């Protein structure tokens, strides 16, 4: 199996402020967290784990032969949870790259994850994250994050406001991060920053501390489930792909 030096970690917390027990909500016949895990698992990375504080989530994943790492319920962010899980992986000294996949993207394409891994290994960036080209109508909601980049694809700034101002086309940021191990270790040691707290975007902590984030272009914007309305969209999309036999 390739990529033995890579770990994929899916942080999943049971309590959500906007959607009760979000990971256990059904999309079709299976839960949100099951769908995320099954999609990610198509990347065929041996070290693929769900990091959670919940026995219920753990039981769901174990039933489909997934691997679970228990983490503390008081961990502040998904990235911090991913790091705590990484430290508990057996023989983790052989792992040099950690992919943090948000646990609310039920139709994430495994090809996007493989592209992140390839780009991370073949660049000098501390972190790599995927983006999709979209029009203004696609990013009006403040839950959608855009990124401004330089001509090489290096991230300059992330915002919940459409950036750059006046553009007709934007780069929509997907909530997946590929970290070099030393970059993840540095990130979790840093205090929250002004811009991070202002925008409520933890990736700004990275930029404010002089670390580099490279972006890689992917084709599709996967549905992210954060609200009841998002869940309805995901269920509708699931019915559509089932009807098409995809």
Curated annotation (Swiss-Prot):
Gene Ontology CC annotations of this record: cytosol
Catalytic activity: 3-deoxy-alpha-D-manno-oct-2-ulosonate + CTP = CMP-3-deoxy-beta-D-manno-octulosonate + diphosphate
Pfam families the record matches: CTP_transf_3
Keyword Cytoplasm among record annotations: yes
Cell location: Cytoplasm
Highest taxon of source: Bacteria
The protein's annotated pathway: Nucleotide-sugar biosynthesis; CMP-3-deoxy-D-manno-octulosonate biosynthesis; CMP-3-deoxy-D-manno-octulosonate from 3-deoxy-D-manno-octulosonate and CTP: step 1/1; Bacterial outer membrane biogenesis; lipopolysaccharide biosynthesis
EC number(s) recorded for this UniProt protein: 2.7.7.38
Keywords: Cytoplasm, Lipopolysaccharide biosynthesis, Nucleotidyltransferase, Transferase
InterPro entries registered for this protein in UniProt: Cytidylyl_trans, KdsB, Nucleotide-diphossugar_trans
Single GO biological process annotation from the record: lipopolysaccharide biosynthetic process
Molecular-function GO term, any one: 3-deoxy-manno-octulosonate cytidylyltransferase activity
Family: Belongs to the KdsB family.
Function: Activates KDO (a required 8-carbon sugar) for incorporation into bacterial lipopolysaccharide in Gram-negative bacteria.
Record-linked HAMAP family: KdsB
Name of this protein: 3-deoxy-manno-octulosonate cytidylyltransferase
Organism: Rickettsia prowazekii (strain Madrid E)
Gene designation: kdsB
